[in-house]
């Protein structure tokens, strides 16, 4: 419930100069009607996934008050140090942004043009940039050119998620192409369409629990569904075997076997897999770094999810600076648990 305090301030008059002073209080600032505790609560709620309008409605203050509190925050950028490991990724905000993160978010640039990225990192001395050892990113070729130019001692690491994603998409398109060869009312078509998720999964991670399949009208385990479906197409069986072998070698970090299998089947597969294999061979050294190290873009992907949540909750910030402040407040401020204290005046 909102509480209204009627505060009467005592006045003191100097007997010598006759000047009058008013007693000060820690409850509110001078010439303000909103208490300091409410302002502190605004700062606390800015770290949560709440829109600025919801914060204002919850604390019974205006939205402008919340915006003014947000404007009071400032984050000074230090160009005298960089982490040993960095992650690069982009997310959508109007024209697109690029984020850099280690254990804490370093910065968010207002676009992902090479000029913007170059001008930002040129603010760091060469000696500082040479201390970076690893940078994880997706397969965007434009970033790799910048990394090799401005970070001389860096090893580029392709995020493992994007490697698996490329393989999964190639097999998904292959399965759809084979599925469309059958009549839409036939059993092979319905089996490939209804149980597509089982084919995308790693075979080693399939559940052992049985379920009732409406397609086959019987209770089957996931691996039994796959076995019954693969009987309909020799081509699909070959591609599924290749897909699962690539996943196995990648999960077991077998670099040699992974690329040997790609080289062996490069000219035998369809254009979906040929495109993926061509990309993998072009970035062979970076994928090898991913298999030989434990670094990934997991933290940054989680950060991007938070950025999108903030953007959605606030119906999109028109001001990029305010959006950047909100992200930094949410990520970099330490949240301490507070307890209500009851006292008598």
What are the roles of these predicted feature ranges?
Residues 31, 104-128, 134:
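Active-site beta-loop-alpha junctions of metal-dependent nucleic acid enzymes
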Residues 46, 111, 138:
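Conserved residues at beta->alpha junctions
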Residues 163-184:
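Short alpha-helix plus adjacent loop in nuclease-associated cores
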């Amino acid at each position: 419930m909102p509480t209204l305090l009627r505060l009467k301030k005592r006045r003191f008059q100097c007997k010598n100069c006759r000047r009058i002073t008013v007693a000060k209080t820690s409850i509110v600032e001078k010439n303000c009607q909103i208490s300091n505790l409410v302002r502190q609560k605004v700062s606390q709620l800015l770290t949560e996934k709440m829109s600025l309008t919801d914060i204002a409605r919850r604390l019974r203050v205006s939205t402008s008050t919340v915006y003014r509190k947000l404007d009071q925050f400032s984050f000074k950028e230090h160009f005298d140090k960089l982490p040993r490991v960095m992650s690069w990724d982009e997310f959508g905000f109007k024209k697109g942004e690029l984020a850099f993160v280690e254990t804490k978010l370093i910065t968010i640039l207002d676009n992902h043009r090479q000029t913007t990225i170059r001008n930002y990192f040129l603010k760091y001395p060469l000696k500082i940039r040479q201390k970076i050892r690893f940078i994880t990113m997706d397969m965007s070729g434009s970033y790799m050119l910048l990394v090799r130019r401005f970070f001389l001692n860096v090893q580029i690491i392709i995020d493992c998620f994007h490697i698996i994603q490329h393989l999964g998409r190639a097999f998904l398109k292959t399965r759809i192409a084979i599925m469309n060869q059958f009549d839409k009312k036939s059993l092979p078509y319905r089996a490939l369409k209804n149980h597509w998720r089982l084919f995308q999964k790693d075979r080693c991670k399939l559940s052992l629990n049985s379920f009732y399949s409406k397609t086959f009208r019987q209770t089957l385990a996931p691996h039994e569904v796959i076995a019954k479906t693969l009987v309909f197409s020799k081509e699909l069986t070959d591609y599924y075997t290749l897909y699962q072998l690539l996943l196995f070698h990648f999960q077991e970090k077998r670099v040699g076997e992974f690329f040997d299998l790609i080289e062996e089947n490069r000219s035998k597969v369809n254009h979906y897999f040929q495109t993926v294999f061509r990309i993998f061979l072009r970035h062979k050294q970076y994928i090898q770094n991913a298999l030989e190290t434990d670094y990934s873009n997991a933290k940054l992907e989680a950060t991007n999810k938070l950025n999108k949540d903030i953007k959605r909750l606030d119906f999109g910030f028109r001001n990029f600076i305010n959006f950047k402040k909100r992200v930094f407040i949410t990520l970099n401020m330490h949240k301490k648990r507070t307890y209500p204290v009851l006292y008598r005046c």
